[in-house]
Swiss-Prot record:
GO terms for cellular component: cytosolic small ribosomal subunit. Residues 109-130 are annotated as: Disordered. It comes from Malacoplasma penetrans (strain HF-2) (Mycoplasma penetrans). This is Small ribosomal subunit protein uS9. It holds the Pfam family Ribosomal_S9. GO terms for biological process: translation. Belongs to the universal ribosomal protein uS9 family. The keyword RNA-binding does not apply.
Length: 130
């Protein structure tokens, strides 16, 4: 078998993840580090691996990720979307399974910008009646 690789791009908040799936034994590397070294807790790792678990391909692919920007939760969400999109490239039969579990939907929520005259996005100065 030749060098087959499936690529996917995921975004979440301000994080961008470039995911590459290669047929293999199931190892995952994030910025050349293992997930339990890169992420502080296991819940984030479980969230990131969901597309592989749902499609039952956890042991079929090696996952190589380059992720930049944002925090750990945003990065995990970006990786999750990238893995789901790469799985679609590998096998389009996964579309229905991933679509039902909302793995293919890009989460549009992002930080709201600060407005002038306010202390934050919505926090306003204290109101004085007199």
């Amino acid at each position: 078998m030749s060098n087959v690789e499936y690529k996917g791009l995921g975004r979440r908040k301000s994080s961008v993840a470039h995911v590459k799936l290669v047929p293999g034994t199931g190892k995952i590397l994030i910025n050349q580090r293992k997930p339990n070294e890169y992420f502080p807790n296991s819940l984030v790792i479980q969230d990131m691996e969901q597309p592989l678990v749902i499609t039952d391909t956890r042991k079929n692919f090696d996952v190589f990720v380059k992720v930049v920007g944002g925090g750990f939760t945003g990065q995990a969400g970006a990786i999750r979307l990238g893995i789901a999109r790469a799985l679609l490239v590998a096998n389009n039969d996964f579309r229905k399974t991933l679509k039902v579990s909302k793995m293919l939907t890009r989460d549009p929520r992002a930080k709201e910008r600060k407005k002038y005259g306010l202390y934050g996005a919505r926090r306003s100065p204290q109101f004085t009646k007199r």
